[in-house]
Amino acid sequence: MNVLSCSINTLTLRGLYDISGVEVGQHFYWKIGGFQVHAQVLITSWVVIAILLGSAIVAVRNPQTIPTGGQNFFEYVLEFIRDVSKTQIGEEYGPWVPFIGTMFLFIFVSNWAGALLPWKIIQLPHGELAAPTNDINTTVALALLTSIAYFYAGLSKKGLGYFSKYIQPTPILLPINILEDFTKPLSLSFRLFGNILADELVVVVLVSLVPSVVPIPVMFLGLFTSGIQALIFATLAAAYIGESMEGHH
């Protein structure tokens, strides 16, 4: 019994030491000109883009009138993105389908790649590879692109009259309406970053403590929530664009 108790205590302490070694925010930098960029984010982003482009090329290289296989899957995804865009934007959704689709697919594949691909096999001088959406710089960039998109949508439809929304329904709300333009990208970026980072940290901690079958259900739950986060981001992006074009809250 004493030997068994000592073994359990040793395993528990080893798990706790492993948890204490989990590092967050370690980056491998490239120097480009006078700037430092997060190399691991660029590497994993290129991998995600390659997966998307490669899958699309393979799926539609021989398009058929009656779609099958990969073509059928991509057409289903396109219909899904069109439905989301039309629901949130309205009848003028057409030009925005590529933007909403790009956001959804990039985030979805990034999240799943972080959960499924064995990034830790690739050793870096500092830090480690992870999902692109596990880095706050990526999520902030996606949120800023969304902000630029809905500003462009509003200005292209209403011209300078777009700015009248800041004093509607009363000029008293001007500060709040201006603040809203800052809170939208903040909420988009931190929601996505926080959920993906938390999911990966939970899996790492569980694997350190119980490296058997216990973390597997959590990993499947992470895959589900990763897809939901991609859908939430794309839906909110489309809703913001539709709101800027229609001028209602």
UniProtKB/Swiss-Prot annotation:
GO CC list: chloroplast thylakoid membrane; plasma membrane; proton-transporting ATP synthase complex
Subcellular location: Plastid, Chloroplast thylakoid membrane
Lipid bilayer topology: Multi-pass membrane protein
Residues in coiled coil: none
Residue ranges of the TM segments: 40-60, 97-117, 136-156, 201-221, 222-242
InterPro entries per UniProt: ATP_syn_F0_a_bact/chloroplast, ATP_synth_F0_asu, ATP_synth_F0_asu_AS, F0_ATP_A_sf
UniProt key word Cell cycle: no
Swiss-Prot/TrEMBL keywords: ATP synthesis, CF(0), Chloroplast, Hydrogen ion transport, Ion transport, Membrane, Plastid, Thylakoid, Transmembrane, Transmembrane helix, Transport
Any one GO MF annotation of this record: proton-transporting ATP synthase activity, rotational mechanism
Chief location category: plastid
Gene3D superfamilies in the cross-refs: ATP synthase, F0 complex, subunit A
PANTHER family: ATP SYNTHASE SUBUNIT A, CHLOROPLASTIC
Biological function: Key component of the proton channel; it plays a direct role in the translocation of protons across the membrane.
Family: Belongs to the ATPase A chain family.
Oligomer and partners: F-type ATPases have 2 components, CF(1) - the catalytic core - and CF(0) - the membrane proton channel. CF(1) has five subunits: alpha(3), beta(3), gamma(1), delta(1), epsilon(1). CF(0) has four main subunits: a, b, b' and c.
The protein, known as: ATP synthase subunit a, chloroplastic
